[in-house]
Amino acid sequence: MTVFTRVRNPAHARVLSHLDSLESEAVHIFREVAGEFERPVILFSGGKDSILMLHLALKAFAPAPVPFTLLHVDTGHNFPEVLAYRDRVVAEHGLRLHVASVQDYIDAGKLRERPDGTRNPLQTVPLTEAIQQHRFDAVFGGGRRDEEKARAKERVFSLRDEFSQWDPRRQRPELWQLYNGRHAPGEHVRVFPISNWTELDVWQYIEREGIELPEIYFAHEREVFNRNGMWLTAGHWGGPKEHERTETRQVRYRTVGDMSCTGAVDSDATTLDAVITEIAASRLTERGATRADDKMSEAAMEDRKREGYF
């Protein structure tokens, strides 16, 4: 009888760390999209998740340039620090950036301002029309499953119909990291390369890689006011109202979106280590703690996704 003996060579037994495994998965997804699609685009707002996506895309194709265009839906109520960071990064890497302006749609009479002043729900029309105009067939987004329940059930490759609408019943199985990008003319696929990352993973990776972030993510003094339990930034977008009082507090932002619906959190975390410690101790997701637009209804995010939102 022949006996086969398995020989293990420690030199070839390298085990990927948790962060290395997540990075490898994301890099694979970027390369898969580059091979399957003709006109991919990365949604890039200058927020931490889109910054992470761009960093991973740069790694996936280095030393060649990133073969994707960037797209930002500008509400006109974005944080100035984040826009400045966005423009600096685009210039630094010689990237192409398309900006779809909500203000342009309001000026043209295609959209109306909401009574509460927020423009976050108004992003859907500029986004979907930009996708149609530029014929993008794959759209990278920074959504993560730990953020919100609608995002938790969405696939990495998320098929959208010719109206950019999402139907959860049309989702495809994704066994063994095999992704099906097939779509009919006029349809496109939303792609979420960091879907399996948590907020803590994101920050630990940012620390490991030495990725620069806008200062808004670290504790600083800011003039804010309280609305429905959230500390919102005072500004030109229409806040605060007459009965709302502003005060100066030391805060930071866990997630960044429209100023009118993104709440700051009290914090003294001025370094990456301090932020990571703070997040590890938190029992609330970043969107659950700081996004007013997710509190409009129990299914607010899923309703917007069905209409074409990120």
Q: What name fits each language-model region?
A:
Residues M1-F310:
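Nucleotide-activated chemistry modules centered on ATP-dependent adenylation/adenylyltransferase
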